Amino acid sequence: MCGRCKTPLLADNKPVTVTDATFLAEVERSPLPVLLDLWAPWCGPCRMVAPVIEEVAAEMAGRVRVAKLNVDENPVTAARFHVQSIPTLLILKGGREMERIVGVQPKAEIVQRLQRIAA
């Protein structure tokens, strides 16, 4: 909440879809830490983790921004972060990678890592 005008700040309660073209504005310039889900539609484990990512976005709204990037459609950003396997979750702050989670992990593990960065 803005201390001046009392409006919510980036109260995203759902993941935002980002592309190579929107990455700078949506992720790098975010005032909040960002959980970036790098995924592809054909990836079974990516589909398994998708509901967890939705829950994390809802629970951490206002403290963390959650974004999803399809690696097949956005190869530039995937290459920039040297993504070798998916799902890969990156926790970014100021556009810099702070943590990397590869593969399906329990929600509690993801939240714990986010809380450390967002504190």
Language-model segments: which ranges?
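Conserved residues in the N-terminal Rossmann fold of short-chain dehydrogenase/reductase
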Residues: 68
